[in-house]
Every structure is written in structure tokens, then in C-alpha cells.
Amino acid sequence: MVFDTTFCSWEQRKLLTVLNKIVDYRGRTPKKLRLDWSATGHLALSALNVKMGYVDKTVDAHYGDDHLYSVWMKDNDLYEGQVLFTTEAPMGNVAQVPDDNKYILSQRTIAFVPDRSVISDNFLAVVLSASKCQKNLINRASGGTAKGVSQKTLSEISLDIPQSLSEQDKVSELIKKLSEIITLHQQEPFLCENSVNGGVELC
């Protein structure tokens, strides 16, 4: 999706200039912490279960107990709505933390803490998912079969942002509604009239 910046005041900013922090534990594993996964507990979010637009809690589900969580995440608790980004295999998936359950940020996935005086979590998710940004990421990605992005790559990414936070909210809400409509039509095939044989078929 391409945003039309004609009718409101937008600006172009480098991604890293609108962030207060990047939460990045990509090299961390239970083994390196001399601990192990548990049967239940805090779900780990990785590039396998962070999909484009949502978190699939059933895929590659690993859990950590309270001790593993505290050692791993320290004081960087993820919060509802925070933007997640997969850096490799697959590269460029964008989703938001679905609730305030304490998740473990795991393999090939990072989380952004935006400067909320400049950009909202919701709009950050929207603009990172947009086709323009995704194409820029692909063009700048390194690696062979498994493309990936480094922090240097992220520093080169530019975002088109409304200067008004209320305008960001409007755009985010519109995109959310459009996504819900698209998902609804994908999940519920509708009947249409077949003009050739006079019957009906699934479209």
C-alpha cells in the first residue's frame, strides 16, 4: 500500500530517529543462560510464530518459566501493541504484541519502542508493513537464500509519517478496518451467480 501525502502534512524520517529503543535478544538461547524451556509458562516469540500482521501462538511454541523470563528479558517487558519485526527467515514480518502477557523475545525477532511524541505503535506497524517499506527492506537485505537485515540496514530505512498523531490514528484505524474486511472475505468464500450455466459457484 502506498500512502498519499498530498492532503496532510507528512514528513520523511529515518526509522532509528523515531525509536527510543530496539529490544534485541537474537543471540540469546536457554542453553547460553544455562537454563531450559518449560512445558508451560511464558511463550517465546520468534520468526516462526510472528507472522505478517499477527502472532500465531500455536506454531513452534516454546515456553519459559518465571526464572528464565526474568533472566532473559530483564526489565524489557513487552507490552500490548508493541511492534515486533522479524529480521531473518522470514525477513520483514511485522506484528504487534497481542496482549500484556509476558512474552519472551526470541530468535530472529526484535521489538521497537517508539518515541510516542513522533509516532504511535499502531502507525509504526502500518508503515513498516506498507509495500514501499517492504520493498526497501528487500532491496537492502543481505544474505543468499535466507535474506536478513542488520541494524545498519534499519538505519537506512526512511518512513513517511504524518506529523499529526491524530492523523496517524486515523490512517491506522482505516488500514485495520480494510485488513479485517480482506481477512473476512478470505475466510468466508461467498456465493456468486454463474452466468454460464445459471447455477452458483464459490468465488
Positions of PLM-derived features:
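Short amphipathic coiled-coil heptad-repeat segments
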Residues: M1-Q12, Q187-C203
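Non-catalytic DNA-recognition/assembly elements of restriction-modification systems
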Residues: D4-R28, L165
